[in-house]
């Protein structure tokens, strides 16, 4: 079951929250359709901004939209001109007052949706699919991910018969509900047809209440230091001392440290 279902829906209420937060009775179907139109318009017109997720909140006639983007400057524009244009277009689309909250994704290398979109853009630019997957895999692991799984499906490399290929590194426990697994999907439009890209990223186990989970998420983002990278100890080394040189060199260094230095007499004394 965990292998087939969407990881976000499978863990809804356990480690993930709803991306749309409002309540309605008679207007439920109308508001759901309105949310779909908002998301489609944003994904179509702000594709270059690298949208990770869109969250929508409603209060009476006011709609609050949270945009998580890898490049928020594209959404904001010069002196906020682009953000005002987007807000105006959405108000025309919905006929309601719109409030935009634009947030930056601190570590795009460990965001599954952005990783999938990056691979798809490389495939559309005729980059070899294996090279694109390996590069994304290494970047995610170097940025602090505990495990990653990437799968590409379609006419890979322009082959006549479609197939699926994937790479995996680390742990990706899809059946564990407490596991914080991010999932993303994007389609690459190539001359041979569309290629689907799926990405699963494991960031660790999550426990406690929603408030505690939010605090843990903020702590992980602060520990990654923005965009992550290979600073500090390399992955897999931890705090272990450098073992290069072998046991003999270590024993010789220890013996020389324990041997007292010879005392020399002053010739002029």
Swiss-Prot record:
Domain KH type-2: 38-106
Domain of life: Bacteria
GO cellular component entries: cytosolic small ribosomal subunit
GO biological process: translation
Cited Gene3D superfamilies: 3.30.300.20, Ribosomal protein S3, C-terminal domain (3.30.1140.32)
Keywords from the UniProt entry: Ribonucleoprotein, Ribosomal protein, RNA-binding, rRNA-binding
Keyword rRNA processing: no
Quaternary state and interactors: Part of the 30S ribosomal subunit. Forms a tight complex with proteins S10 and S14.
This protein's name: Small ribosomal subunit protein uS3
Species assigned in the record: Cutibacterium acnes (strain DSM 16379 / KPA171202)
